[in-house]
């Protein structure tokens, strides 16, 4: 197969990684990973390819052996975020299907974009340092040279030495835990389902565990483990049962959740076996567990069946949003599918407004040539991708679509695909005689338009029963002289409050500073532990230029590192008080993950790219 991912320099059309062994020591003093990584690569040519090209970025390579013999290698000039390709000589080439063994002595550097190191002071109980990795989209190459593309999948063995507990994206071999030099332990994990490089994950620190379901545990700091267990245990088993009924049985053995320190930049990262999750889902009210339904859904869409490049990322995220909403509807009731989709529509509108309706990043399929995938990251592949899947569901009917779901995930399990292969799979399935009555409908699908038209997709009719009350309250506020009461939102879910706040954010005329204050006080949005609600409220207060809220915004920006909150808050604070925005960023920049820090710099006009624009 020809290489089709523009975000990799690797020649994966000539060589394909089959197994990866990571023998790494976590060095908290030097803030680096060091050790050896072994790649077993299968030749895909008949001795024509005389070199293996791997992705690398800011990683130190000390030596390389090919089949246990030292070989020539060279790190080429850096090409921006794509990194510096590593060229390794294979003088004799290899027969097609032959597997060669590449052993590399490696060490990460301070420029590594995949790791975050926290001092004991940055953790909750202040007892031990903490380290975690975040490899998506193209950051695995800064951990060790690899074929850093979702179009290549490999099984993994992890042998990780650390003075503190280690979790990794595999199943633990607890019986194999061994003492290493200096009292450190070697933690062994195996991942027997082939996964792409971006799902390689490690974390280490003072970590405790508690069960949250028959196949699931939560891992987090010892002081938080009880509240995390309470937050997640009610829904975990229900989510798993609903997911397995919808697709087919879970293939990964265990499903665990690692709740990370607050500087984790995403809501969740679907690392297999261990979802890495933001602590902002632990809100004390069980209102933000949808993130777990989302990350669990990735066990089928994204992790088992994977988009072949970030250009087709909607195949991961659009499908996952669809499965998440089906799971939530199965557990909480059918109206919650539409309710969540309406919330998502608002996020999609916001993202498209931020980019501009004609921007190429608002297309479903994006040309990534010369583009850093992190720059294109937004709600678009999630929500516009969801609308692509949901459109097909409505077109053929739920009963028929539910038969397609397991067919699709079975056909592409352990493989990667692009949008056209998805299209062909859909057409192939519905070409059966029993679906003859759908022939004209399916022939009318404008695939090219759906894939490449920028801006909002057509909006379907949604069941608004759960949101009508939210819009009604927003209408009262729009009149400008409304006196609020805490009873206005009695019995509302956190998401209903979010819909209401989203409507207020969209008012043509912002609230007055006084109204914004009343809103925060009456509905307990200033003291809430729910960061989703607090952020939505602060965006209203900033637009209202309520200066009494500015310091609260700055404080929150020092407590959370999730980009969903950090980026819009910095953009909004920057509009009303740039000096405070800049001092807040300066004060907290080392708290943020490198990915979040780079994005916030762009939002504040501090990065070299932003200065050029």
Curated annotation (Swiss-Prot):
Cofactor(s) essential for the protein: Zn(2+)
SMART domains, alphabetized: Leuk-A4-hydro_C (SM01263)
Keywords for this protein: Cytoplasm, Hydrolase, Metal-binding, Metalloprotease, Nucleus, Protease, Zinc
Q: Which residues cross the membrane?
A: none
Pfam families, alphabetized: Leuk-A4-hydro_C, Peptidase_M1, Peptidase_M1_N
List GO terms (cellular component aspect).
Answer: cytosol; nucleus
Q: Which GO terms describe its molecular function?
A: aminopeptidase activity; epoxide hydrolase activity; metallopeptidase activity; zinc ion binding
* Cellular localization per UniProt: Cytoplasm; Nucleus
Which residues are listed for Zn(2+) binding in this entry?
294, 298, 317
- Record's cofactor remark: Binds 1 zinc ion per subunit.
PROSITE patterns attached here? ZINC_PROTEASE
Which reactions are catalysed by this chain? an epoxide + H2O = an ethanediol
Positions with a binding annotation for a peptide: 134-136, 265-270
What biological process terms from GO does the record include?
A: peptide catabolic process; proteolysis
Q: Which InterPro entries did the record assign? A: Aminopeptidase_N-like_N (IPR045357), Aminopeptidase_N-like_N_sf (IPR042097), ARM-type_fold (IPR016024), LTA4H_cat (IPR049980), M1_LTA-4_hydro/amino_C_sf (IPR038502), M1_LTA4H (IPR034015), Peptidase_M1 (IPR001930), Peptidase_M1_C (IPR015211)
- Where's the active site on this chain? 295 (proton acceptor), 382 (proton donor)
Q: Which domain of life is it from?
A: Eukaryota
E.C. number, please?
Answer: 3.4.11.-, 3.3.2.10
Matches recorded under PANTHER family: LEUKOTRIENE A-4 HYDROLASE (PTHR45726:SF3)
Which family is it part of? Belongs to the peptidase M1 family.
Q: What does this protein do?
A: Aminopeptidase that preferentially cleaves di- and tripeptides. Also has low epoxide hydrolase activity (in vitro). Can hydrolyze the epoxide leukotriene LTA(4) but it forms preferentially 5,6-dihydroxy-7,9,11,14-eicosatetraenoic acid rather than the cytokine leukotriene B(4) as the product compared to the homologous mammalian enzyme (in vitro).
Name of protein: Leucine aminopeptidase 2
Q: Give the source species.
A: Pyricularia oryzae (strain 70-15 / ATCC MYA-4617 / FGSC 8958) (Rice blast fungus)
Record lineage: Eukaryota, Fungi, Dikarya, Ascomycota, Pezizomycotina
